[in-house]
């Protein structure tokens, strides 16, 4: 077999592999476009002001998702207020202060393991502990605490990876200039890793918005409009839980597709915000 034959076979092989890669990419994009287009075509016609600003009433025979939108915002607020200090603080300690490397490796392994656990298991544990053991009742508080446990490993690991991208020379330079340990972490490390930290937090919000399995057990199915403090201990369905209720229990597929459209738009907005803020903070 001469060199010319080998060269021809390589060209044929490369072209074949390139065509296969393009085919896989095209099928993936086509499937994504079809899925988004189908949901939008079924859901956008049902997005009326009455649906967005009203609430469901069996007596008046009306359907509205305003309580579910507010419950989703309540859940995000409760979860992020608790998980941000815990996750970012733990990541700073493990990366900058912890001296026992075996313990750090063990915690990192545990965090990575927890990220792979199905969310419905977190929901079951949250129901047994927060709802029944602590007697918090199904509501925003129990659901938010369950989500804290679920997304804490994600916040921890993404923050850790962002902190590790800061060159060691930056730390040594700050310490060499007389800065204390905490001042060095606050002014040098965090300022250079803020883009990755913010991006990870925004993506965590996206996971909260799309979560349903854990909240089925802990937040409840309530479709009643409540203020924040009442919703903390009252059954409060988020958008994803409401989608399940309307699609499976009430047979309101049009409303379910409208909720799915809102969730798709929220997910797109969150992802675009993560990319935009990440790039903007990185430039600054």
What are these regions (language model features)?
Residues 30, 72, 76, 80-92, ...:
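Hydrophobic positions within alpha-helical transmembrane segments of bacterial inner-membrane proteins
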Residues 112-148:
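Generic hydrophobic transmembrane alpha-helix motif, especially the helices
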Residues 86-126, 154-161, 284:
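Cytoplasmic-entry segments and transmembrane alpha-helices of multi-pass inner-membrane transporters
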Residues 16, 160, 164, 202, ...:
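C-terminal transmembrane helix and the adjacent membrane-cytosol boundary/short C-terminal tail
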Residues 80, 158-159, 181-219:
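Transmembrane alpha-helices
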Residues 56-63, 215-264:
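Interhelical loop and adjacent transmembrane-helix boundary motif
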Residues 118, 177-178, 191:
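Glycine/proline-centered hinge or cleavage motifs at structural transition points of membrane proteins
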Residues 3-23, 37-79, 100, 245-254:
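Periplasmic/extracellular loop-to-transmembrane helix junction in inner-membrane transport proteins
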């Amino acid at each position: 077999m001469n060199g010319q034959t080998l060269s021809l076979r390589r060209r044929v092989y490369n072209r074949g592999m390139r065509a296969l890669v393009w085919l896989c990419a095209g099928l993936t994009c086509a499937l994504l476009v079809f899925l988004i287009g189908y949901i939008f075509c079924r859901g956008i016609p049902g997005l009326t002001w009455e649906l967005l600003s009203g609430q469901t009433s069996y007596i008046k025979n009306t359907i509205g998702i305003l309580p579910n939108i507010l419950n989703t915002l309540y859940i995000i607020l409760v979860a992020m207020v608790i998980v941000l200090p815990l996750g970012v603080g733990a990541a700073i300690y493990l990366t900058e202060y912890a001296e026992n490397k075996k313990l750090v490796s063990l915690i990192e392994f545990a965090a990575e393991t927890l990220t792979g656990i199905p969310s419905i298991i977190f929901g079951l544990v949250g129901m047994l502990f927060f709802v029944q053991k602590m007697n918090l009742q199904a509501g925003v508080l129990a659901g938010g605490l369950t989500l804290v446990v679920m997304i804490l490993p994600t916040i921890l690991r993404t923050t850790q990876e962002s902190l590790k991208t800061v060159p060691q020379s930056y730390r040594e330079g700050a310490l060499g200039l007389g800065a204390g340990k905490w001042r060095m972490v606050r002014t040098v490390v965090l300022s250079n890793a803020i883009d990755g930290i913010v991006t990870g937090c925004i993506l965590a919000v996206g996971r909260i918005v799309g979560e349903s399995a854990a909240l089925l057990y802990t937040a409840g199915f309530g479709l009643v409009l409540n203020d924040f403090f009442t919703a903390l201990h009252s059954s409060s369905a988020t958008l994803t839980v409401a989608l399940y209720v309307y699609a499976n229990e009430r047979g309101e597929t049009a409303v379910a597709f409208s909720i799915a459209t809102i969730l798709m738009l929220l997910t797109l907005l969150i992802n675009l915000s993560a990319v935009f803020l990440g790039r903007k903070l990185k430039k600054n």
